[in-house]
Amino acid sequence: VFFAAPVFAQPAIDPNLPKFPTPPPKVTAEDSIIDPPYADAPEYKVDPAVPQGEIREFILYSEDSKIYPGIVRIENEISAKRDTYGNRTPAPEAQVSKPGRYERHVFVYIPKQVKANAPFMVVQDGRSYINRMAPVLDNMIAAGRVPAMIIVATDSGGSDAQGSQRGLEYDTLSDRYSNWVEQELLPAVSQRYGVSFTSDPEGRATMGGSSGAICAWTMAWYHPERYRKVLSYSGTFVNQASPLDPKTPRGGWEYHATMIPKAAKKPIRIWMEVGEKDNHFDDPENTRHNWPLANNRMAAVLKQKGYDNKYVFAMNAGHVDNRVVRQTLPSALEWLWRGYPK
């Protein structure tokens, strides 16, 4: 027997909220609209004259986790349901997922200059970033442009979107993932490699693309005493909640629609990017699933509240566009870590 997911009233958009066209205008000098052709930043070139960090890898297993024992999506009529524009519709967890095992690969970049109580960055969907970040950090650390930080680049528990382990971790608006990082992931890294991490929130950053990006923001939002630096590519600030939560009925859309506007400003710095042709760029607003629109709204609200925010809108670019990442990542890291002791 299948049960329909509960329907929640969709609150009206705040009429006082700045509304961006596509592309948005610059709000401050910090914001930018960039155009193709996109090119690799010079920091990607390996320089044998600078100290080279090491990349280590290990696996975490679901049976060893108290916080994420593991789920898999149930392939049924509910989990397969889409709206007119092809978006999955949120549903209660019991209707779309069941217990299931996963293996999670974790990649750790340790710079040659590492010290005790090191600054660090947690990177979601880690295998997608670790190899391209290593030469960038080697060069930038040697040049004194960023601190000698450790990168903890972790994969999710697998699959994607509603009903999946990745969706549960990344698209859920709660402190559960941040607690997992604090209580299970970082201790596992320290135990294996003998490194230690700073407790200073100014020395703790988090990064991701797509759902990994909203996850990064969520880590800082719920625990700004842990994380105060966020780097977001094509953040999923849309209605992709997993599982459905009556407290946040529109998932990540709630951040710019209700949560940030109603809350006191938090001490978070965020660099964020979206592509002109990002996911569902031509979907109407009432789908709550248009990435450029959601990121435009997010940037507007952050500026309105006085956050330290840089917004990059990439013309003729897609979702977590690799060309854009390879052009902007070094400057994004430098902006994010400005002012921190090198």
Question: What is each PLM-predicted segment?
Answer:
Residues Q10-K342:
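Non-catalytic cap/lid and distal C-terminal segments of serine-dependent acyl enzymes
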